[in-house]
């Protein structure tokens, strides 16, 4: 698929906009602003879940909800030590095995603060193959005391994400970034609305494009919005694991190839009739 410059700029912007669970509103505003010209109405609930509706002209048309989530994994400050080192709790499934030495963006009362997750030099480190425990990770903000950290505007509970922004590989063939889970699918929803509008396609159903919050800690936003919307059918868009990289057993994890299109989820929670319609 060849994207327009406008679409690519929107994708890059929402990927680069921090949106850890509980702090989704900046990314939600960007998403709502982009999708607004292509839909009939836009709404946001008290927690930040945002949705836009493309209405069918048919009387008593059923409602289809298309859902992605706006939040991303990250960290929150759990403890500020007297020596100035900061200890964190993870939001969602942040992998501590790849955390050491990584830069983080934290968002305090005075704005953004950059820190680095500390890492002992390989020359003096024991258990080289051992992944650290979460409580062993500490963030270094270049401070020597708790007071210095607090002077930066940081406190317990403040949120942070990795610094990694969008990076194109192989002349644009591949895109690498934090928060592709699930900002990419929110982008797909917005682009779907744009394509329907620009091509003049009249939907047979009312379509609710939903970008929900707090998925990384239990699908909370999607559950609340489903009760509110009461759709006749719903399709959730999220990322999955490609298994075509070295060391992965396709017999165990399935045969999923990067760049070969979307995957359809099967299981007790997935209605077989809806899956069959999607496969058509």
Q: Which residues does each PLM region occupy?
A:
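N-terminal hydrophobic/helix-forming segments and targeting peptides
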Residues: 1-280
């Amino acid at each position: 698929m060849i994207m327009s410059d406008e679409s690519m700029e929107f994708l890059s912007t929402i990927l680069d906009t921090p949106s850890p669970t509980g702090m989704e509103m900046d990314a939600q505003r960007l998403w709502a602003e982009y999708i607004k010209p292509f839909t009939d109405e836009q709404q946001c609930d008290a927690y930040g879940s945002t949705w836009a509706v493309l209405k069918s002209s048919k009387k008593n048309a059923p409602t289809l909800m298309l859902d992605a989530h706006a939040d991303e994994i990250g960290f929150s400050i759990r403890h500020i030590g007297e020596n100035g080192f900061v200890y964190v709790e993870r939001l969602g499934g942040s992998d501590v095995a790849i955390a050491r030495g990584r830069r983080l963006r934290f968002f305090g009362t005075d704005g953004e603060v950059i820190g680095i997750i500390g890492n002992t030099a390989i020359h003096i480190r024991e258990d080289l193959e051992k992944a650290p425990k979460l409580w062993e990770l500490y963030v270094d903000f270049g401070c020597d005391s708790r007071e210095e950290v607090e002077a930066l505007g940081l406190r317990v509970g403040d949120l942070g994400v990795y610094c990694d922004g969008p990076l194109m590989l192989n002349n644009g063939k591949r895109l690498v970034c934090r928060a592709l889970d699930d900002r990419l699918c929110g982008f797909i929803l917005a682009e779907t609305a744009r394509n329907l509008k620009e091509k003049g396609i009249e939907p047979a159903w009312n379509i609710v494009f939903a970008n929900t919050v707090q998925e990384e800690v239990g699908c909370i936003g999607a559950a609340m919005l489903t009760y509110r919307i009461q759709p006749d059918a719903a399709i959730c868009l999220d990322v999955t694991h490609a298994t075509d990289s070295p060391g992965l057993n396709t017999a165990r994890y399935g045969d999923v190839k990067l760049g070969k299109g979307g995957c359809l989820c099967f299981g007790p929670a997935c209605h077989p009739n809806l899956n069959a319609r999607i496969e058509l």
